[in-house]
């Protein structure tokens, strides 16, 4: 039986006799020596991850101006920071987007620009007080001008993350990257074998006060992260570190098309091998870490699981999905994760980094709750018009014109002989056909690619689809494509009027 203490390991770090390996190397060591042998041989295992961590931000202090100002609103390079703190304290979120450049530039870019030594435009406003009389401030600053610049990240270093795919017929732009139609690709995130929390799944050595590698400098875990869900192996960490000591090699801003900005963070955690149980945990392989592939075509919180896979399958470059070979790609960098684990290994090996035990362990049970919503989410069936005029595809344009005139309705659902939706015809389509002397069947002038929605779909999703494609109405259909009604922009406008 092997038992060590952190004090004993730190003495070895101090005298240079410590044996430190990466989590990737530990797999082979346990295979060759067994768990007990590995626990005797190895003192520290280093881990690493480098990925998009949206829930990150910078806590900063600007120092007092002359005359002084109690900042109410604050912008850095036209990116707004939260300033509802003391006079010149502020928090800049990585995902906050620019007022002028939109999602191409955001809080993450401001943070990286600061780290790279660039000068920032600062604009601040206030209501003015006797002790803080100034109302407007414009200046330029660099990182060196700030009293404090503490990277304070509410949720980083997920233990693992669900992969993503897309069953719809169009490209989806998401925080999981670009998802191609018809299950065209799978994207995933996480370092697998090098993942810090996957190498200590019971959080024996990782918790409040643990010293870590953060953005190229030493940082600390200050507790579990938001949405910490240990019961489903989706643990998270809340971290802090001094931005002034970090490196842009391990902190990079990014913008995801159609989604927004994020901050790529490099995190590494050393795990002291105190006993055989911890040694066994640090021998986890990609094959041992499973996650679900979710369908992002469903615009709902609870997305359907398409398949369960392990990280070895994801990292192989392709998996079988819906009967075909589907490419996989990572949004995080395993190359950088490996680089972090190796750099941390060198720090420990050369006495530049000492391991520490948490003053309080992370919770091992529990899961994140969904938002409490006091107002029912309106569904399409709640606002749709259940009276809809239909026409057969083999009827004439004159028949269609007569139906629109008799019913004062601008949209006709075109159905087959068995009642399935096959197209849609509008008053504009009929006017165009008449102008071009086309009096053939409805099928020759109808729109065949019809946007539709389901009765139990949230109205918000239907409204987004109407707006995206610039149409004013969509037929509501069941699973057999039978027409149940129609939802129009007018229906949605009336709903909003009732809400507000």
Swiss-Prot record:
Which residues catalyse the reaction? Answer: 131
Span of domain CBS: 384-441, 446-500
Top-level EC class: transferase
Name of the protein in question: L-aspartate semialdehyde sulfurtransferase
Could you tell me which species this protein originates from?
Methanosarcina acetivorans (strain ATCC 35395 / DSM 2834 / JCM 12185 / C2A)
Q: In which family does this protein belong, per the annotation?
A: Belongs to the L-aspartate semialdehyde sulfurtransferase family.
What's the stated role of this polypeptide?
A: Required for O-acetylhomoserine sulfhydrylase (OAHS)-independent homocysteine (Hcy) biosynthesis. Together with MA_1822, catalyzes the condensation of sulfide with aspartate semialdehyde to generate homocysteine. Likely functions through persulfide intermediate.
Query: Gene3D superfamilies, from UniProt?
Result: CBS-domain
Pathway listed for it is:
Amino-acid biosynthesis
């Amino acid at each position: 039986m092997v038992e060590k203490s952190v004090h004993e390991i730190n003495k070895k770090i101090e005298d240079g006799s410590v044996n430190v390996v990466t989590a990737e190397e530990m797999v082979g060591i346990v295979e060759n020596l067994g768990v007990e042998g590995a626990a005797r041989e190895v003192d520290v295992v280093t881990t690493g991850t480098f990925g998009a961590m949206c829930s990150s931000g910078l806590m900063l202090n600007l120092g007092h101006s002359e005359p002084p100002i109690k900042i109410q609103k604050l912008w850095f390079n036209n990116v707004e920071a939260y300033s509802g703190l003391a006079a010149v304290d502020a928090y800049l979120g990585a995902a906050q987007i620019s007022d002028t450049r939109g999602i191409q530039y955001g809080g993450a870019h401001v943070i990286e620009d600061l780290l790279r030594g660039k000068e920032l435009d600062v604009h601040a406003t206030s209501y003015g007080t006797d002790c803080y009389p100034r109302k407007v401030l414009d200046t330029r600053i660099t990182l060196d001008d700030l009293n404090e610049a503490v990277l304070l990240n509410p949720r980083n270093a997920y233990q693992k993350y669900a992969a993503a795919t897309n069953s719809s017929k169009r490209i989806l732009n998401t925080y999981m990257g670009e998802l191609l139609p018809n299950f065209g690709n799978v994207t995933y995130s996480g370092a697998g074998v090098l993942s810090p929390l996957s190498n200590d799944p019971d959080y024996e050595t990782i918790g409040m006060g643990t010293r870590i590698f953060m953005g190229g400098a030493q940082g600390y875990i200050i507790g579990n992260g938001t949405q910490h869900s240990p019961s489903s192996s989706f643990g998270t960490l809340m971290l802090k570190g001094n931005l002034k000591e970090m490196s842009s090699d391990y902190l990079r801003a990014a913008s995801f098309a159609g989604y927004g900005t994020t901050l790529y963070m490099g995190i590494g955690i050393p795990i002291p091998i105190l006993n055989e149980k911890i040694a066994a945990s640090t021998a986890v392989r990609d094959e041992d870490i499973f996650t679900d592939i979710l369908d992002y075509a469903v615009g709902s919180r609870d997305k359907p699981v398409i398949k369960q896979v392990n990280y070895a399958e994801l990292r192989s470059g392709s998996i079988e999905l819906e009967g075909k070979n589907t490419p996989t790609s990572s949004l995080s960098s395993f190359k950088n994760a490996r680089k972090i684990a190796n750099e941390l290994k060198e720090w420990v090996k050369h006495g530049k980094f000492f391991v520490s035990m948490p003053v309080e362990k992370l919770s091992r049970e529990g899961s994140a709750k969904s938002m409490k919503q006091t107002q029912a989410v309106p569904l399409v069936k709640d606002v749709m018009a259940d009276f809809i005029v239909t026409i057969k595809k083999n009827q004439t344009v004159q028949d269609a014109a007569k139906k629109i005139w008799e019913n004062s309705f601008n949209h006709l659902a075109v159905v087959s002989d068995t009642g399935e939706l096959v197209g849609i015809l509008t008053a504009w389509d009929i006017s165009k056909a008449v102008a071009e002397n086309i009096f053939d069947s409805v099928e020759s002038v109808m729109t065949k690619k019809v946007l539709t929605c389901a009765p139990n779909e949230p109205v918000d999703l239907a409204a987004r689809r109407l707006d995206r494609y610039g149409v004013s109405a969509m037929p509501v259909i069941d699973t057999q494509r039978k027409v149940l009604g129609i939802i129009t922009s007018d229906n949605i406008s009336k709903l909003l009027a009732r809400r507000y």
